[in-house]
Amino acid sequence: MKPPRRWMYGRGGGKGKPAGLLLLGVFLCLSVVLLLLLHGSSPSLEGEGRKPEAVEAAGGGGEEEEVAVARAEVEEAPLPPGNARLAFLFIARNRLPLDLVWDAFFRGDKEGRFSIFVHSRPGFVLTRATTRSGFFYNRQVNNSVQVDWGEASMIEAERVLLAHALKDPLNERFVFVSDSCVPLYNFNYTYDYIMSSSTSFVDSFADTKAGRYNPRMDPIIPVENWRKGSQWAVLTRKHAEVVVEDEEVLPEFQKHCRRRPLPEFWRDWDRPIPAEAWKAHNCIPDEHYVQTLLAQHGLEEELTRRSVTHSAWDLSSSKDRERRGWHPVTYKISDATPALVKSIKDIDNIYYETENRKEWCTSNGKPAPCFLFARKFTRAAGLKLLDLSLIAANGASTM
């Protein structure tokens, strides 16, 4: 009796091969068929982690459905292994004059708990020729916009940075940093301070000063949602997504929020300011946008309504032109002293006059300094503070 045909497969010609080789050939063929079947039924790499329902919902819908599916993917996709990160979002003109200060700060992390994104002028690239810190090599975003101070282009730059940083699911907090900003504490203290809170840190208060809110924004942005504050915020991932997905508030800012057409150092003018300039609304977009947007979405209960970045705005007695006009005090090398740093670190509460509100500063439920960062510092001032180990110190002490 002849053996079953399946055991004769591949023998050919009467000079048969060992049965073991035939079995191996059969198993290889079956394996190939099985792999092909599995490949045809599994999601692509681009859609990995997406539920079948979400894939079906993506077809045949409009832009709103696409946004909803994208949001669902972010919520459903499991985090890859690794530590939650702080995404540092630097807004710079060109180079980063304080890159060596930040280099010392980032060296304090040994666990991969940060990422860096830099928005500079279009075409600027961070290389060995343009930065002295390897942490910043090629960290510029590739679709930057030309930013003009006091214009809506500043908030467009913020949105570009957030969009890039949100691509990394490990980024859980988003820290806006200026090119004149220094870290007051070491990395570990800064990380623990920010991550111990489930809220965003957003300087936000009701703006009652006449001339800033433009009634043309109503009814899309009612006056009761109008807020003001520092642009140097720390956002949770949820709030960062709200900013990037906004299609309602941003257009109103682009049309109706513009700074008053005064010269930069108008306080020093020795001639009258044109009357038309005083009649114009004086709205600085980046000092209102995030605050107003989050109020619009009813998210103020999810905020710690203060900034963690210190700026000095007491300009009344200053005779230095660089310290007057629209901008906060710039600290020079002569200002960079232990007394200055101590005075900033000692601040433990902030008072908001328009709301008669005092914000006591805490971290992890305990009293804490209000500020983790400070600006504006020249390069020389920042390096002096670093040499004195007054900032970004990575020793045993966090304070």
Curated annotation (Swiss-Prot):
The chain crosses the membrane at residues 18-38. Glycans are attached at residues 142, 188. It is found in: Membrane. Its main location: membrane. Its EC number is 2.4.-.-. This is Glycosyltransferase BC10. GO terms for molecular function: glycosyltransferase activity. Keywords: Cell wall biogenesis/degradation, Cellulose biosynthesis, Glycoprotein, Glycosyltransferase, Membrane, Signal-anchor, Transferase, Transmembrane, Transmembrane helix. Belongs to the glycosyltransferase 14 family. Residues 1-17 are cytoplasmic. It comes from Oryza sativa subsp. japonica (Rice). The lineage of its organism: Eukaryota, Viridiplantae, Streptophyta, Embryophyta, Tracheophyta.
